[in-house]
Amino acid sequence: EATYFDFNEEVLSGIIKDAADMGFELFLLDDGWFANKYPRDNDKAGLGDWNYNKKKLPHGLGYLVNESKKKGIKFGIWLEPEMVNPKSELYEKHPDWVIGQPNRPLDLSRNQLILDLSNPKVQDFVFGVIDKTLSENPGIAYIKWDCNRFVTNSGSYFLSPEKQSHLWIGYVRGLFSVLDRVRAKYKDVSMM
């Protein structure tokens, strides 16, 4: 968070060097590294579009992972895969993937909505985000898995009307399913 959303590859490389010189063990790339159509330059857009920002990181995440490795420190990445901004490609494609009650306005908190992990398609998407990020950048050693808002307006566009009371159970089971899949494939990657 030393740079908030205002950084580029050169700035981050300098921070990695400084961190290594001070004896740090890990560099964590926080929020703002992703999204292109709606760049993540503030907290109002891009959340959910988990492709590295080509303007900020023209050589991709792998470049920074390698810079960290060269300096002898581990590389960590910030993700908040359960959340989405309405101003994102993900929300444009899948507005029915969020938690909300039919026939009621959506309730934004921190400019974001919550993805409905009771939906297996959402579970696959969230796992896919993590899987793609880690498989394309095998030197990532740590995931900071953020979740910065509380659930309001709870309802599921996926669950039938009779099953709406099962949202919480389905959500937690869906989250645990994703975490189990990540842990099974990436045993050596720490998550918080």
Where are these regions (language model features)?
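Aromatic- and glycine-enriched glycan-recognition loops and surfaces
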Residues: 3-92, 121-128, 170-177
